[in-house]
Amino acid sequence: MPMMPRADSRFRFLHVEALEPRQLLSSTPWGAGSLDTAEYLLGDVGVTLVLMESQGSVSSEDWTTESIEAVKTKVAEGLQWWKDTLAAQSSVHSLNFVFDTSYADNPVPTTVEPIARTSNTYVTWVNEFLTYVQANSSETISTDIRHFNDSQRQALSTHWAFTIFVVNDENDADGQFAAGGSFSRAFAFPGGQFYVAPAGRPAATFAHELGHIFWARDEYSGAGSYDDQRGYYDAQNWNAANNPTAGFEQVDSIMASGTLMTDAYAQHISSPSSLEMIGWRDTDQDGVFDVLDVPHQLQGTGAFDPVTGKYRFVGSASVQSLPNLNSSGQHND
């Protein structure tokens, strides 16, 4: 067998070993505490979908295999809207939802029929859920649900996590909670807590409520105000219906209502101020949103090793974080 000619040792190809793949977000976001479960809408988001099943004589609604699957499909569609909208905004960032549907496939028992009560009765059945999953404590519902969401974040290996409660309204006359409560239909507790929606609401509602989870404000009349501020940049709610600026006209937005909301949903757009509240702001127009577009340094030295034929670099890297200006939440950077 002929011998291959030996390569001339005076000439070597430079060999570069690739570093392991990195994403802009690759773990629990830097600086986030256990209660920081939804600071900006980027990366991987854990979603726990919960259905409650009333027991005994109070029951007027019953989940079926078909209705459960319909809910799962609608929720996925509503959240997919945000993925598609981000894709139109940026080619750099990613957004993925990781679902835990175990509490939807096997609805959680409750002593009340949620849709037949006022919306404020959520205190009863959300506490029953927290007890069911062994997450109920002497703390508030807000704290307990955030701790639960944090445990789900760890279990699902995501950056953020929140919970959705979908209420069965199939047999309800108007698909609304009983009169006398704070809300008639869907409502949310912002900053990585949870939202509640009757099953009969459209997919756009599920997209709208997710905006609240990541700090966006309502923009329709009687809800959010133009002087409200929230989100990582503490952005102002400029697209609110009550903006007094001369000549102001509301633009289509997922956080509005009526045709402004439905048109925004159809076009995969939202108001600039609502997008800023969820973290989607690119001040220098370089394609990277401000929250992740932060100064970084790389220092080190390198040399070619003639024995191994490899170039070896030894150094260190450091990165700063953008201050969290949110006037709500935990204020962790």
What function would you assign to each model-found segment?
Residues A203-E219:
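Active-site recognition of the HExxH zinc-binding catalytic motif
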Residues G43-T48, T158-T163, P190-Q193, R217, ...:
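Loop/turn elements at helix/coil->beta-strand transitions in domains of secreted/extracellular proteins
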Residues F189-A207:
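Short pre-active-site segment immediately N-terminal to the catalytic Zn-binding motif
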Residues M1-S27:
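Subset of Sec-pathway N-terminal targeting signals
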Residues T28-S157, Q193, R201, Q299, ...:
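Propeptide-to-catalytic entry region of secreted or membrane-anchored zinc metalloproteases
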Residues S138-R185:
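Auxiliary, metal-adjacent structural segments of Zn-dependent hydrolase domains
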Residues V50-Q55, F165-N171, A199-R201, A216-R217, ...:
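Active-site-proximal beta-strand/loop segments in catalytic clefts of secreted hydrolases
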